[in-house]
Amino acid sequence: MKNTDEKISYLDLFFCPKQNLYTYLEIYKQYSPNEKAFTNLILYFIANVIAVSKESQLLVYQSGLFGEIASSINLSQDPIEDIDVKIFFLSQLSVSSIYENDIMFSLQLQKIYFDIILLREELLLRDEHRDITYILNNSLWGLANVSFCENDTFINNFIKFDIISYIINSNSKSQVVLNPSLKIIGNLLSNKEEFVNKIISPELFHYLIENICYKNNDISIKSIGLWAMSNIFSDENQQKYIFQYNLPDILNDLFELNFPPDSEIDKEIAFQIGKYIEISNDEAVVVLIKKYDICSLQKKMLEKYSYNLKNMCHIYKCHLIMTSLIGIVSKNGEGGKLAVEIFNKNGMTDLIERVILQCSNPIDNEYMKKKVEEIEKMGEIILDEYLSSDTRTISNDDNEDI
């Protein structure tokens, strides 16, 4: 066994951790399990390396260390400090291919994270002088990383242990808790439809709305909250929620906050507008237009993002807005007619012509180039088939209600 000075010299490796990952792994194997304090420190170093490197995550997984740590956790006997560093280490694993290809390991991790949440009071009583907040938070991150796994065991455990209620009733407003919590909810809502219907509740909507609008000014929290909410809307059965919670007004209020053009939040607003239109029947589209003035919001967003179609963020947002535009004007029935009439009156024709002109700018990135080509095609379809058409007009009586 090496002496303390030699062990301390290993800490110099921390200053270039990625290059020394193999050395970390060797050190851990050499000292484990006899010197827990030192190996906990090395495990903490490894966790920080893999947190920023997916390549390193795969390397550590292949070394067997993830499986070793997961199997070594004993929640009923391990000291809190040991549980803390082990859960932090495991929660940094985010490479989806590992979960997809190793179902047993995925289920093992899920059980650990579920057990920690269920045993939180017991863990707190074991050592009243130690804060278990980070253990709980890292367990949420771990669950967030595996929450996309579409297996019945995972879904049934969420329902059985009522993890959603635990998340919703958490008093924390910190990004540390909200980010993984909203990611879990979003992943679950994008899962099986029968599961979605089991967890949708007024409490869930209020939780999402509060975190999108009020509790936290962090743009990333608002963005991931909007993304999570968007996953609720998959078909006409969910259109009632749009109006029950006045969600279009929330989108408009958020857009009026004028977030920086490169932020994610306007992308999520544009995406959610498209979802509302996609799942709405004719009657609902009329409400979106007449009560919530959704056409004006679409125009304002297109005006903001149609000036620079060489910027990747602008291209994404413009593509989403154009998708929602073609979605609403192509609706059959009164809703589509109303949208065409409004866009013909509010200058949308000139705006879309400007968008098409912007599409002629050269783009280096092939993926973005394809997106711009799709924007141009959508613009031409809207102009040729809808806004320039004389066949889709509405009566003067209807016109007075717009």
What name fits each language-model region?
Residues 23-35, 69-81, 115-131, 166-175, ...:
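Helix-loop junctions that connect tandem helical modules in alpha-solenoid scaffolds
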Residues 31-42, 58, 77-86, 102, ...:
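Helix-start/N-cap signature of alpha-helical segments
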Residues 241-243, 248, 253-254, 260-402:
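Alpha-solenoid helical-repeat scaffold
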Residues 4, 28-31, 49, 53, ...:
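Generic recognition of well-structured, leucine-rich alpha-helical segments
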Residues 16-27, 45, 63-72, 107-119, ...:
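Alpha-helical solenoid scaffolds in eukaryotic proteins
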